Each structure stands twice: as structure tokens, then as C-alpha cells.
Amino acid sequence: ERHTQILDEESEFSVEDLIADEMMVVTVSNAGYIKRLPVSTYRKQRRGGKGITGMETKDEDFVRDLFIASTHQYMLFFSNAGRVYWRKVHELPRAGRTARGRAIVNLLELSGGEFITACLPVRDLKEEGKTVFMVTNKGVVKKTLLKSFSNPRATGIIAIDIDEGDELIDVQITTGEDNILLATAKGKAIRFPEKDVRSMGRTARGVVGIRMEDGDSVIGMSLAADESTVLTVTENGFGKRTKVGEYRLQHRGG
């Protein structure tokens, strides 16, 4: 008696089904070079060890971002022009430990003068309750639901409408319940609840997050939990550590 059955059925199959779900170290340099390599490349050492070279950089270049992400995760790339691009981690160039990697401009369809200012690893683009919080050089902030970025396009899509002369400088994934800390080049800072900023569509401009004097600009953003501390470092190497609670919580636009 024959037990073999031939079924006339179709099943969905993608190249990703053949790619192992492996944890990778993704590094991005300030000059815009990116690469990935397995976490296992970095052997565990004791405290006080010398460490190993993780990326070769040219003069005046340095590693700006480092992420641990699965090969099946997405990387969202946000540009200074307010656009967002996608790549799966397994699509990023795999290179040796000391290699520079590949220029991001050769991976994404960027316009002239456009460069990447923020990278975010994301497992599920349709995850409920997650938002994307953005800030520009001139202090404009905007919050958009993560699922609004779930339809990738090779040419990217608008993440925020940028005013002339302004640039997107930082992006974070938030829960909708976080506190936001913005810092400026002249040493000013503001901490306000994320709830002060309503969710907006992708093409919206955003609202004022901090008001600044002429010549000042926002240089960074952090999620500021009440029990955390803030490390502030100046261009000349001076630094200090401050409890977040010393930055009083106020409304956005202060």
C-alpha cells in the first residue's frame, strides 16, 4: 500500500526563511560607514581588559552608533531632510572586525546633500503602543505612531516636514509615556512629558519642543526616566553627572 501523498497546494516562501535568526553587532561611523558582524566575534573579557578593534576608521572619523540586532530585524534610517529609509539587518554589509564597512549612501537612495542622522533597530514595525519621537536642530519635536512606517519604499518616505534651514538631528522609539530631555549647544536643557506632544501623521511639521535664543541649537535628545542620571560633556572634555530630578519637569515649548 502506498502512503505517499502529493498535495497540490501553494505555500508562501521568502529568501528570509533561509537566513538564520542571528544576533549581530551593527556599527555606524560618523562619516556614514556601516557594517554588521556576529556578536560571537567579540569574545567575553574580564573587567580591565584591553579590548579589541571593532572598526577601522579614517582620520577624524569615529564610531557614532552601535546596536545589537537580529538579522531579521529592520533598521530605520532617518535623514537630515526628514525622510526615513528601511533595510533588514541581513541586507547590511557583513564585514570583518577591523573593516570600515560600506558607505550608507551606497545602500540607500539619498538625494544630494542628504545624510543619515539617526538609525533605529526595530523588530516589528506594526507593534502597538510604540511611537517614533523626532527633534530638529531648531527645537521642533514630533511624535508619530511606529506603524505609520510599516510600508517600506526604496526611495524612502517623509517622516517629518522640515522647515527651510532646519534639519532632523535625533530620533527615538518611545512608549507614549516617556519623559523627553532636550539639550542645546549653549548648555540649556528642558525636560517634558512625551504626552505633551500629540501623535501626528507622517507629513506633519511638528510643534515647538524648546525655545532658544538666537544662535543656539538642539544637539541631542534622551529619554529621561525619573531614577536615571544625565552625563553632560562639553566640546573641551569637561563633564558632569546630574540626577534627572534636578531638571524640573515642565511643559514643552519652555
Predicted features and spans:
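Short, structured "edge-of-domain" segments at secondary-structure transitions
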Residues: 1-254
